[in-house]
Amino acid sequence: MADTARSVASGMVVALQANYLEVELDVAPDGCPGRLLCTRRTRLSHRGEAVYVGDRVRVEAIDPGQGRAVVAEVEPRHSFLTRPPVANVSLVAVVLAVEQPSFDPDQASRFLLTAERTGLEVILLLTKTDLLSAAALERLVTRLQGWGYDPLAFSSAAGTGIDALRQRLAGAQLSVLCGPSGVGKSSLLNQLCPDLQLRTAAVSGRLQRGRHTTRHVELFPLGPSARVADTPGFNRPDLPEDPQELGVLFPELRKQLDPWPCRFRDCLHRGEPGCGVSTDWERYSLYEAALIEQSSLSRPSRGG
């Protein structure tokens, strides 16, 4: 028993529950379950070192009988998302419904901008596609391709698109699903991982917004080395504060700048004379409105 208590192992934090962490081990010691409920070493708190879902960790003081251990060290992260907090993400999948709630270009763009800010690979998933006619869906896909995305279409009701989606996510070690609540993230995960049976909720009729059924971040296995994170839904992500950062978050604007960069270093690409960016693209009005919104938020108030 003493030898077991001194044993160590490595793994990944797959869930946070109150003051405990669930760690899935890479290789479980003999007689030990593959997933352990863990506390943190006090020295981690003293060093100000937080532990998040997705972190690679070393655990010690393993108690196989109780399925318990202590997180002793956190390995360096190669990426970190702040909202929701997830470490070591390699792909961000923005999930948007085509109906119930209706597709909202402004809201869709805000989620895509938030995803682009991570600097990670971003893909777009369209859910509830059975609620649109084939022609209407084709028009929407063509529109989004003009934004610089090649969306994957999915319907849990019709059972279509799941194989292509599973194959796409299996190529990333850790994917995060994000998007407004009520767009079908939990239904999508139930299709990807049939054993989960995550709780789903209807969309409220008046606001066309979903009730939040996911309350915490948790990782689920998609294969031997791939995991996907279900995250709490949120309805209105924030814009970046830096106006220079805003422009590069639009793939269609980046595409214009790629062959011929604008000759003005601090240009905001608003039709200035000599600017290398055309204003003739669908989301230009949204880009301009976002710049105005940023300006109003950064302007100091006149109140006391």
From Swiss-Prot:
Listed A to Z, the keywords are:
Cytoplasm, GTP-binding, Hydrolase, Metal-binding, Nucleotide-binding, Ribosome biogenesis, RNA-binding, rRNA-binding, Zinc
Location in the cell: Cytoplasm
Residues the record lists as binding Zn(2+): C262, C267, H269, C275
Q: Which domain of life is it from?
A: Bacteria
Identify which cofactors the protein needs according to its UniProt entry: Zn(2+)
Q: Which GO terms describe its molecular function?
A: GTP binding; GTPase activity; metal ion binding; rRNA binding
Sorted alphabetically, the Gene Ontology BP terms of this entry are:
ribosomal small subunit biogenesis
Checking Gene3D superfamilies in the record gives: Nucleic acid-binding proteins, P-loop containing nucleotide triphosphate hydrolases, Probable gtpase engc, domain 3
Instruction: Identify the enzyme class.
Output: hydrolase
The answer to whether keyword Repeat applies is no
Q: Name a GO CC annotation attached to this entry.
A: cytoplasm
Q: State if Ligase is listed as a keyword.
A: no
EC numbers listed for it are 3.6.1.-
What region holds the CP-type G domain?
78-237
Q: What does the record's cofactor remark say about binding?
A: Binds 1 zinc ion per subunit.
Specify which residues bind GTP according to the UniProt entry for this protein: T127, K128, T129, D130, G179, P180, S181, G182, V183, G184, K185, S186, S187
PROSITE patterns, sorted? ENGC_GTPASE (PS50936), G_CP (PS51721)
Q: Which Pfam families match?
A: RsgA_GTPase (PF03193)
Family in the record: Belongs to the TRAFAC class YlqF/YawG GTPase family. RsgA subfamily.
Question: What does this gene product do?
Answer: One of several proteins that assist in the late maturation steps of the functional core of the 30S ribosomal subunit. Helps release RbfA from mature subunits. May play a role in the assembly of ribosomal proteins into the subunit. Circularly permuted GTPase that catalyzes slow GTP hydrolysis, GTPase activity is stimulated by the 30S ribosomal subunit.
Task: Fill in the subunit field for this protein.
Answer: Monomer. Associates with 30S ribosomal subunit, binds 16S rRNA.
What NCBIfam families does UniProt report for this protein, alphabetically? ribosome small subunit-dependent GTPase A
The entry's protein name is Small ribosomal subunit biogenesis GTPase RsgA
State the organism named in the record.
Synechococcus sp. (strain CC9605)
